UniProtKB/Swiss-Prot annotation:
<protein>
    <recommendedName>
        <fullName>CRISPR system Cms protein Csm4</fullName>
    </recommendedName>
</protein>
<keyword id="KW-0051">Antiviral defense</keyword>
<dbReference type="InterPro" id="IPR005510">
    <property type="entry name" value="Csm4"/>
</dbReference>
<dbReference type="Pfam" id="PF17953">
    <property type="entry name" value="Csm4_C"/>
</dbReference>
<comment type="subunit">
    <text>Part of the Csm effector complex that includes at least Cas10(1), Csm2(3), Csm3(5), Csm4(1), Csm5(1) and mature crRNA. The Csm complex is elongated and slightly twisted with a maximal length of 215 Angstroms and a diameter of 75-80 Angstroms. It has been modeled to have a central protein filamant of Csm3 subunits along which the dsRNA helix of paired crRNA and target RNA binds. The filament is capped at one end by Cas10 and Csm4 and at the other end by Csm5; ssDNA is thought to bind to the N-terminal HD domain of Cas10.</text>
</comment>
<keyword id="KW-0694">RNA-binding</keyword>
<comment type="function">
    <text>Csm functions as a non-specific ssDNase. Base-pairing between crRNA and target RNA to form a ternary Csm complex activates a ssDNase activity; target RNA cleavage suppresses the ssDNase, a temporal control that prevents uncontrolled DNA degradation. Viral RNA transcripts probably tether the Csm complex to the viral genome, recruiting Cas10 ssDNA activity which is able to degrade DNA in the transcription bubble, spatially controlling the DNase activity.</text>
</comment>
<dbReference type="GO" id="GO:0051607">
    <property type="term" value="P:defense response to virus"/>
</dbReference>
<dbReference type="Pfam" id="PF03787">
    <property type="entry name" value="RAMPs"/>
</dbReference>
<dbReference type="InterPro" id="IPR040932">
    <property type="entry name" value="Csm4_C"/>
</dbReference>
<comment type="similarity">
    <text>Belongs to the CRISPR-associated Csm4 family.</text>
</comment>
<comment type="function">
    <text>CRISPR (clustered regularly interspaced short palindromic repeat) is an adaptive immune system that provides protection against mobile genetic elements (viruses, transposable elements and conjugative plasmids). CRISPR clusters contain spacers, sequences complementary to antecedent mobile elements, and target invading nucleic acids. CRISPR clusters are transcribed and processed into CRISPR RNA (crRNA).</text>
</comment>
<dbReference type="GO" id="GO:0003723">
    <property type="term" value="F:RNA binding"/>
</dbReference>
<dbReference type="InterPro" id="IPR005537">
    <property type="entry name" value="RAMP_III_fam"/>
</dbReference>
Length: 299
């Protein structure tokens, strides 16, 4: 199995968080998976892509910053209380707590130091701009859209196991774009497929019986769920939204799905799943990707 970095260089994008006037820095694996499903449908290769996606070896992570190298999510639950210097005064403790709270992503080379108690400032990878748009012929025709504008040296990447089909779909997707308001020109990107640095690839795993961090917003299969919740340190994220039916020309609300956010840490790996979240009586499956790839924590 060959993992690759799929590096995407955007100019502007709208990665929504529920409203037009907000935008995130990155996106979860289910978003790019949905985009790949639509891309494969346009190319007449949906069945082939779904057959590949349902194989155990298929892998897809959330998107993370790439700035002179890969960044990873902050490991949730670290550093442990006993790893923090207890000799500092109260003001310094508060300052360190604020640093840790603001931190979203860590450069790969800083992850182990963070696990062992060293704190880092949050890197600025992008700014969120607000753009005013016009909708002619509609009441209240002015509206605002938040966009993520990346710094010149920042891209986003996902990790996936390389295949000819995935390469073809990702190459096509760079022109279709990712995220919202694509008709306004947001979300297109330049794609670069690179080998994964050895110091990262050596710690990627799907089956490990010691401490790990999920690189994918994921949901365990039922048999693994209870143990993951008991032994893990995690944040839950809600996946919701609407699905469009061409048969009725209407939007229907998808089933809500709660998953472990990337950066969640566990005592061992678990098996994930692809969940059908179609609305009641919807004519076809609506798939939500929740199969994790893990990073070994060496603490």
């Amino acid at each position: 199995m060959t993992y690759k970095l799929y590096i995407m260089t955007f100019q502007n994008a709208h990665f929504g968080s529920g409203t037009l006037d907000s935008s995130k820095l990155t996106f979860s694996a289910d978003r790019i998976f949905s985009a790949l499903v639509l891309e494969s449908l346009k190319m007449g290769k949906l069945d082939a892509f779904l057959a590949e996606a349902n194989q155990d070896k298929f892998t897809l992570t959330d998107a993370f910053p790439f700035q002179f190298g890969p960044f990873l999510p902050k490991p949730i639950g670290y550093p442990k209380h006993d790893q923090i210097d207890q000799s500092v005064d109260v003001k310094e403790v508060r300052r360190q707590a604020k640093l840790s709270k603001k931190l979203q992503f860590l450069a790969l080379e800083n992850v182990d130091d963070y696990l062992n108690g060293e704190l880092f400032e949050n890197e600025e990878h992008a700014v969120i701009d607000t753009v005013t748009k016009n909708q002619p012929h509609k009441d209240g025709n002015l509206y605002q859209v938040a966009t993520t504008r990346f710094s010149n040296d920042t891209s986003l990447y996902v990790i996936a196991n390389e295949s000819d089909l995935l390469n073809e779909l990702m190459s096509s997707l760079q022109y279709s774009g990712l995220g919202g308001k694509r008709s306004s020109g947001f979300g297109r990107f330049e794609l670069d497929i690179q080998n994964i640095p050895l110091e990262l690839s050596d710690r990627l795993t799907k089956n490990h019986s010691d401490k790990v961090m999920s690189l994918t917003t994921a949901l365990p299969v039922d048999a693994d769920l209870e143990e993951a919740m008991e032994d893990g340190h995690y944040l839950l994220t809600k996946s919701s939204g609407f699905a469009f039916s061409h048969a009725t020309n209407e939007n229907y609300r998808k089933q809500d799905l709660y998953k472990f956010a990337s950066g969640s840490t566990f005592s061992k790996t678990f098996e994930g799943q692809i969940v059908d979240v179609r609305p009641l009586d919807f004519p076809h499956a609506v798939l939500n990707y929740a199969k994790p790839l893990f990073f070994k924590l060496e603490v």
